From Swiss-Prot:
Naturally occurring in which organism (per UniProt): Delftia acidovorans (strain DSM 14801 / SPH-1)
Functional description taken from the UniProt entry: Binds directly to 23S rRNA. The L1 stalk is quite mobile in the ribosome, and is involved in E site tRNA release.
InterPro entries assigned: Ribosom_uL1_bac-type, Ribosomal_uL1, Ribosomal_uL1-like, Ribosomal_uL1/biogenesis, Ribosomal_uL1_3-a/b-sand, Ribosomal_uL1_CS
Taxonomic superkingdom: Bacteria
NCBIfam families to which the protein is assigned, alphabetical: rplA_bact
Protein name as catalogued: Large ribosomal subunit protein uL1
Alphabetized PROSITE patterns for the sequence: RIBOSOMAL_L1 (PS01199)
GO process terms (BP): regulation of translation; translation
UniProt GO cellular component terms: cytosolic large ribosomal subunit
Stored CDD domains: Ribosomal_L1
């Protein structure tokens, strides 16, 4: 773990671990603690009231953030024929079938998102052991296995983030960069929270959104009052 700077230690001392901060105040604290020379990402962790060990309570999906993430995704598409042309026209960085699979097997993967037309899954299915551990395996639940490859590419380029609850019942996502103003960060977080609410499992009982905290790539985490999140 990287050592905290004097500034980060001072700010960490100002953050009350049990206090719920208004979103604007939480972001201000996080930005003050972000001392890296690069434009750090602003990340969020959302504790959900689910038992992730139960298959019917696994929360997974994708949402296009209204203000993007501050990073343009590199997109690969497995498709052929007309679908391949649609993907290229939509801005896909790499498009192919067996040739693209060969590149993946060789370790040549210059992309952040993988999308597949349904008929391409016969090829993509052989790449599970490579793409899966990297979080790149296409899945219909997050819209990356779809006949509408053009829309999927546009969504990925527009700042779509995928989310999946971990074993502890927590969702981790990036909602922007330190350079974003508070309104954009708040709008992005509101969109994510809305998507999570819509993904609530029917079997989830009690309080669903339990805790929300924001942090920068290398900074401290600050808990947020969910009542102050709405855009």
């Amino acid at each position: 773990m990287a050592k905290l700077t004097k500034k980060q230690k001072a700010l960490q001392g100002k953050v009350e671990s049990t206090k719920l901060y208004a979103f604007a105040d939480a972001v201000a604290l996080v930005k003050d603690a972000a001392t890296a020379k690069f434009d750090e990402s602003i990340d969020v962790a959302v504790q959900l009231g689910v038992d992730a060990k139960k298959s019917d309570q696994v929360v997974r999906g994708a949402v296009v953030l209204p203000h993007g993430t501050g990073k343009v995704a590199r997109v690969a598409v497995f498709a052929q024929g007309a679908k391949a042309e649609e993907a290229k026209a939509a801005g896909a960085d790499v498009v192919g079938m067996d040739d693209l699979a060969a590149r993946v097997k060789a370790g040549d993967m210059p992309f952040d998102v993988v999308i597949a037309a349904p008929d391409a899954m016969r090829v993509v299915g052989t790449l599970g052991q490579i793409l899966g551990p990297r979080g790149l395996m296409p899945n219909p639940k997050v819209g990356t296995v779809t006949p509408d490859v053009a829309t999927a590419v546009k969504n990925a380029k527009a700042g779509q983030v995928q989310y999946r609850v971990d074993k502890a019942g927590i969702i981790h996502a990036t909602i922007g960069r330190r350079s974003f103003d508070n309104e954009k960060l708040q709008g992005n977080l509101a969109a994510l929270i809305d998507a999570l609410n819509k993904s609530k499992p029917a079997s989830s009982k009690g309080l669903y959104l339990r805790k929300v905290a924001v942090s920068s790539t290398m900074g401290v985490g600050v808990r947020v009052d969910t009542q102050t999140i709405s855009a």
